[in-house]
Amino acid sequence: MNKQAIQSIVAEVVQQLSQTTKQSNTVPMAVSARHCHLSIEDVEALFGAGYELTKKSDLSQPGQFAANETVTIVGPKGSIEKVRVLGPARSITQVEVSKTDSIKLGAVPPLRESGDIKNSEAITLVGPKGSIYKKEGLIIARAHIHMTPDDAEAYGVKNGQCVRITSQGERPTTLERVLIRVSPKFKLEMHIDTDEANAGLISTGDTGILSLYEEAL
């Protein structure tokens, strides 16, 4: 085998390895519109005693679903109707909106990891059978990636770590400090809100490339 043939083979192998590495760092993306999670007590307060959420469609994360039920959320300066409830019911009530939504409401919710609502913004929810005022619970959710422990090992990351994601599309956009969330119950998927999606022309089903920071954030 001559030198030129060897160089050609080496170049091909390097290219294949590069493509494999790139593919291994690819993460599916999904756009999450405004929605709310309700406690059992608040489900009953909004929809009636003994009421249970009914499934409209399954979500990508196992066991989670979009309910048929919707509510109106009310802030100091405005309201938004038909905000989808996600099920099943949780231990606490939480409303997730985009920055654009918050401006319409006249509210100033903090950027938080889902579930971290302590000292967050107040919000009123209105349902067909009643309304409730929550002194905290309105947040803008941080961009995050759900993954299993096996996924985390493959990507070389751990729960609570932050990474960088660059979308692949007409308007490549880099999202910084994307939170890693690891659980055996999760399915690999990155979640961003509608503001982030609109800025990068990103749609559910698009992919991004994960890269690590030199130092943990």
Curated annotation (Swiss-Prot):
**InterPro entries this protein is in?**
Asp_de-COase-like_dom_sf (IPR009010), PTAC (IPR008300)
Pfam families assigned: PTAC (PF06130)
Please give the catalytic activity noted in the UniProt record.
propanoyl-CoA + phosphate = propanoyl phosphate + CoA
Where mainly located? other
Q: In which pathway does it act?
A: Polyol metabolism; 1,2-propanediol degradation
* Localization, UniProt: Bacterial microcompartment
Which residues take part in binding Zn(2+) 1?
Answer: H35, H37, E96
Q: Which residues take part in binding phosphate? A: R90
Q: What is its EC number?
A: 2.3.1.222
A GO CC term assigned to this protein in UniProt:
bacterial microcompartment
Indicate the enzyme's highest-level EC class.
Answer: transferase
One of the GO biological process terms: propanediol catabolic process
Q: Where does CoA bind?
A: V31, S32, A33, K77, R84, N198
GO terms of molecular function: acyltransferase activity, transferring groups other than amino-acyl groups; metal ion binding
Keywords of the record = Acyltransferase, Bacterial microcompartment, Metal-binding, Transferase, Zinc
The record's remark on the cofactor is: There are 2 Zn(2+) ions per monomer; Zn(2+) and CoA bind inbetween the 2 domains in each monomer.
Q: Which residues bind Zn(2+) 2 per the record?
A: H144, H146, H191
Q: Which cofactor does it need?
A: Zn(2+)
Q: What's the record's remark on domains?
A: Formed by 2 beta-barrels, each is capped on both ends by short alpha-helices.
Biological function: Involved in 1,2-propanediol (1,2-PD) utilization within the bacterial microcompartment (BMC) dedicated to 1,2-PD degradation by catalyzing the conversion of propanoyl-CoA to propanoyl-phosphate.
Stated family = Belongs to the PduL family.
Return the PANTHER family for the record.
Answer: PHOSPHATE PROPANOYLTRANSFERASE (PTHR39453:SF1)
Put simply, this protein is called Phosphate propanoyltransferase
Which organism does this sequence originate in? Priestia megaterium (strain DSM 319 / IMG 1521) (Bacillus megaterium)
